[in-house]
Amino acid sequence: FAHEVAKRYPHITVALHTDHCAKQYLDGWVRPLLDMEADEVAHGREPMFQSHMWDGSTVPLDENLAIAEQLLDKSVAARTILEIEIGAVGGEEDGHSAEINEKLYSTPADGVKVAQRLGLGERGRYMAAFTFGNVHGSYKPGVVKLRPELLGDIQREAAQAVVDGRIASAAGAVDFPNGKP
């Protein structure tokens, strides 16, 4: 349906994205979609989705990246973009929850590992959703401690390379005077 609607509005970019696919759903959801899309592309057609999200936030980083490597290869064949979640997002979403603690903060070492395992775009296009204290849900002021400076630290440590990034759930975000923290 979305593809047909998009044809009527060529001046608007329409992109379809699968969001938050946890490990237990990969074999019944994202992997079959990527295989189907690779077949479509091989036959000269467009993929159904433009991007897919692998949410490895509940597994150890090395396992997360091993799965991400496999999915990135499939994503390249399907001409899609892979989004990976690095670190735990606090709060609750889709039946998964994480406490509000230090695990909510990705580290520069995490960014380096991502770049080492997935490359800097030469292996395929991906977005890395690093966590910096972001949470799902609403919280009283002061409960959520966002540390967006971590994103700059991660980028610098990952060989000063630009890795497409995404902010996963911005609950707790505040307006800064003059647009600066």
Which functions belong to the PLM regions below?
Residues 1-11, 23-165, 176-178:
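Alpha/beta enzyme core
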